[in-house]
UniProtKB/Swiss-Prot annotation:
GO terms for molecular function: DNA binding; site-specific recombinase activity. The active site is at residues 239, 283. Keywords: Cell cycle, Cell division, Chromosome partition, Cytoplasm, DNA integration, DNA recombination, DNA-binding. This is Putative tyrosine recombinase TTE1313. Signal peptide: none annotated.
Length: 290
């Protein structure tokens, strides 16, 4: 019964809340882990009490989970029981009144310009994998793209002659890329990306299919471990490093936000206040690898 109820809950979220696939997966994972915990303690999910949830949160803390992870788990559990209560599957919501632990705000981790240079000076090799990986990492630092945006790029979205890429996932935008990224992409497209019939994705795995989110993370971690074990490197850290280095070098916040895809809201109009030529000018002046 629990599995079918969780399925109904996730379907409700999908239809009514319009959550991303990753967010839905987080809800599913959090709720299923809580149900497993209750099952191991002989507790039916319909009979859970406030103390059951509080004890579970304490259990997560004892497991060394971060406050952010515990807060997210509680948020998922609350959503699950709000749903059950609204659908009259339970008479009382046991999650009501439980507050999440305060999450400590940490300074965002970024790489130094020297660390980025060390990373991108690595000998990636000239085979299919090496050319792809070099182009991927160069582009991520050059553009500040999210993983989902990088893997969604198509060949037709890249204009190497003009030094621009078109990002179509999320808020569509045209952003400049520097000479290092252009050179790496050109070499990858010409020598490393083998034509695959019907496959338009820019970045492919070694089987000729579109690179996945997990594949992208794996590539980044591989080179972090090779270059400097313990180096804090994830796709999001590359994105944050792009923004921080631009701002440190004097770029204005508004232009950097436009490049990152943030919407600037003025009254009832959502305006792109930075022209393409202005963005290119700022990029060439302030990006370390323009």
């Amino acid at each position: 019964m629990a599995e079918s109820v969780v399925g109904e809950f996730l379907e409700f979220l999908k239809k009514n809340k319009r959550l991303s696939k990753n967010t839905l997966e987080s809800y599913s994972r959090d709720v299923e882990q809580f149900l497993t915990y209750m099952n191991e303690h002989g507790i039916n999910f319909c009979s859970a009490k406030k103390s059951t949830i509080v004890n579970y949160l304490y259990f997560l803390k004892q497991q060394g989970k971060s406050q952010a992870t515990i807060s997210r788990a509680l948020s998922s559990i609350k959503a699950f029981y709000h749903y059950l209560f609204a659908k009259k599957k339970i008479e009382e919501d046991p999650s009501y009144g439980i507050n999440a632990p305060k999450v400590e705000k940490k300074e965002p981790v970024t790489l130094t310009v020297e660390q980025v240079d060390m990373l991108l000076s690595f000998d990636f090799g000239k085979d299919e994998k090496g050319l792809r990986d070099k182009a991927l990492i160069e582009l991520m630092y050059a553009s500040g793209l999210k993983v989902s945006e990088v893997i969604s790029l198509k060949i037709e979205d890249v204009n190497l002659a003009s030094g621009y890429i078109v990002v179509r996932s999320g808020k569509e935008r045209v952003i400049p890329i520097g000479s290092y990224a252009v050179a790496a992409l050109q070499e990858y497209i010409e020598k490393g990306r083998k034509p695959r019939k019907g496959e338009k994705a820019l970045f492919l795995n070694l089987r000729g299919k579109r690179l996945t989110r997990q594949g992208c993370w794996k590539i980044i971690k591989e080179y972090a471990d090779k270059i400097s074990p313990g180096l804090p490197l994830t796709p999001n850290i590359l994105r944050k490093s792009f923004a921080q280095h631009m701002l440190q070098n004097g770029a204005d916040l508004k232009t950097v936000q436009e490049m990152l895809g943030y919407e600037v809201n003025f009254g009832n109009n959502l305006l792109s206040l930075v022209s393409r030529s202005k963005m290119k000018e700022v990029y060439n002046k302030f990006h370390p690898r323009a």
